[in-house]
């Protein structure tokens, strides 16, 4: 019984995490699948669109490292670039 409850909680947590981390929460998982299909059609285009830094208001993983993750002129404060 305990194992079943733990499995249900784990599945719910992973589902919520996937929906929260999606770019557009209105589309949820549908948006993730459409991106994968587009990248398969033109893999070179997906490489060119990637950036090495985070834009303004994007998540940055470690505010104590300063502006290492944020684009030029932005600082990492409270886990987002500003």
Curated annotation (Swiss-Prot):
Q: Does the keyword Zinc apply?
A: no
Q: Disulfide pairs?
A: 53-71, 60-76, 70-81
Point out the signal peptide segment. Answer: 1-22
Keywords, alphabetical? Calcium channel impairing toxin, Cleavage on pair of basic residues, Disulfide bond, Ion channel impairing toxin, Knottin, Neurotoxin, Presynaptic neurotoxin, Secreted, Signal, Toxin, Voltage-gated calcium channel impairing toxin
Tissues expressing the protein: Expressed by the venom duct.
Q: Where in the cell is it found?
A: Secreted
Its GO CC terms? Answer: extracellular region; host cell presynaptic membrane
Residues forming the propeptide are 23-49
Q: Domain comment text? A: The presence of a 'disulfide through disulfide knot' structurally defines this protein as a knottin.
**Family note:** Belongs to the conotoxin O1 superfamily.
Query: What's this chain's function?
Result: Omega-conotoxins act at presynaptic membranes, they bind and block voltage-gated calcium channels (Cav).
Name of the molecule in the record: Omega-conotoxin-like TxMKLT1-031
Origin species, per record, is: Conus textile
């Amino acid at each position: 019984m305990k194992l079943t409850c733990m499995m249900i909680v784990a599945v719910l947590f992973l589902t919520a995490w996937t929906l929260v981390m999606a770019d557009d929460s209105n589309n949820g998982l549908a948006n993730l699948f459409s991106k994968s299909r587009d990248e398969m059609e033109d893999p070179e285009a997906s490489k060119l669109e990637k950036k090495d830094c985070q834009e303004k208001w994007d998540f940055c993983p470690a505010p104590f490292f300063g502006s290492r993750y944020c684009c030029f002129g932005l600082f990492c404060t409270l886990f987002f670039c500003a």
